């Protein structure tokens, strides 16, 4: 999931970050320097821009510090934090599974038992406080309803000649929503059949993106017909970003129940970050009832069980997920298989096709 300010401005999206925020879509020599002495730095998977825009000014005013944000794909933000491990540049990390577990296992996160984690279910946080669910969400696919009149209902539907060269999904190595494609197909079909399916799906695939957020723009521009995504981001882009999008959930077989799983944004404190005191305060604030009550405004589900999924947008989330079967995911098993799955995807699915794997927004 990767969005930037210039992309938003170009395509009229509502997710325009405050002047105090910093967004970077590419990490490397051209990346924006995020840290300043009077700042707290947040590395975040994209999709939550409107929430940050709404809630961070109050934090900045109260604490007298700026919140500088670096936004990229969920795998990318962890990769950057890993590169910087010996000299951390960020204080707080927000990303998706399995990358939050990867960050924890790699020693990037510092245990911090925020008082506001107490209403997060035990299954939705690390026992030692290394991370906790910040915004709950669901994996989904998306179409442009103005163009794709016959909505795909099963995974097999995406293999139809009508979709040749019109499907795109994000790279599992760099995007949590991309890894989610492997997780869901493996859960429904079994691992070997899932990779056989994904190899067949390459006939329909136009390319793969480095993150997932840019796919919403490509869908709305009719450059592709179907893409992967997540419910919160897709609903928010449609309602607040002016994009023509409709989230869809696919079934394993004709007549079957559409199926998905929870794919939450999780938050954690980066070990030895330059401004840990303010990093802890930022986590406390983002997990407060005040902020969590605004999560439904961006079509997210509060991470805290004591904050209801309420309001008009909360009802839209409930309607979107109605009738969809939710399956559990063993994230420890995903972490154990992640490296093998990524290698198998590159070798067996992509192979020597020469297909692009890291498409990003045009410069």
Where are these regions (language model features)?
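Sec/Tat signal peptide C-region and signal peptidase I cleavage site
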Residues: 30-36
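A ligand-binding cleft/hinge motif common to bilobed small-molecule-binding domains
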Residues: 98-104, 220, 225-246, 300
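A bilobed periplasmic-binding-protein/Venus flytrap-type ligand-binding module shared by bacterial periplasmic
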Residues: 140-147, 183, 262-275, 294
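Conserved C-terminal helix/tail region of periplasmic/extracytoplasmic solute-binding proteins
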Residues: 327, 331-363
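Short alpha-helix C-terminal cap/hinge motif
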Residues: 54-68
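Short amphipathic alpha-helical coupling segments at ligand-binding clamshell hinges
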Residues: 55, 154, 193, 197, ...
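Extracytoplasmic ligand-binding site segments that recognize negatively charged/polar headgroups
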Residues: 45-53, 72-76, 89-223, 258
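Mature extracytoplasmic/periplasmic domains
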Residues: 270-329
């Amino acid at each position: 999931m990767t969005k930037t300010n210039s992309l938003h401005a170009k395509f009229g999206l509502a997710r325009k970050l405050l002047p105090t925020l910093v967004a970077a879509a590419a990490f490397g020599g051209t990346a924006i320097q995020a840290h300043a002495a009077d700042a707290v730095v947040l590395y975040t998977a994209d999709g939550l821009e409107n929430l940050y825009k709404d809630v961070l000014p109050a934090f900045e005013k109260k604490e007298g510090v700026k919140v500088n944000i670096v936004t990229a794909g969920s795998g990318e933000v962890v990769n950057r934090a890993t590169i910087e491990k010996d000299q951390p540049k960020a204080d707080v990390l927000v990303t998706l599974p399995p990358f939050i577990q990867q960050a924890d296992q790699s020693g990037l996160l510092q245990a911090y038992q925020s008082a506001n984690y107490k209403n997060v279910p035990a299954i939705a946080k690390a026992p030692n406080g290394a991370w906790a669910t910040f915004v709950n969400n669901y994996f989904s696919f998306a179409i442009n309803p103005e163009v794709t009149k016959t909505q795909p209902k099963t995974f097999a539907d995406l293999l139809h000649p009508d979709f040749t060269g019109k499907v795109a999904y994000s790279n599992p190595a760099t995007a949590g929503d991309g890894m989610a494609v492997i997780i869901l197909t493996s859960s429904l079909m079994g691992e070997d059949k899932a990779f056989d399916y994904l190899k067949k799906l390459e006939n329909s695939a136009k390319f793969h993106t480095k993150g997932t957020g840019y796919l919403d723009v490509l869908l709305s521009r009719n450059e592709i017909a179907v893409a992967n995504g997540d419910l919160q981001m897709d609903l928010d882009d449609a309602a607040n970003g002016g994009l023509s999008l409709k989230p869809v959930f696919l079934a394993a077989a004709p007549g079957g129940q559409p199926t998905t799983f929870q794919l939450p944004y999780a938050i954690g404190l980066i070990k030895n970050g330059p401004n840990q005191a303010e990093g802890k305060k930022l986590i406390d604030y983002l997990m407060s009832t005040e902020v969590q009550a605004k999560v439904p405004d961006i079509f997210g589900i509060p991470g805290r069980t004591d904050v209801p999924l309420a309001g008009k947008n909360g009802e839209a989330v409930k309607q979107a997920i109605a009738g969809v079967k939710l399956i559990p995911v063993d994230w420890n098993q995903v972490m154990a298989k992640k490296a093998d799955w990524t290698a198998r995807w590159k070798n067996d699915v992509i192979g020597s096709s020469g297909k692009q794997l890291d498409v990003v927004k045009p410069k």
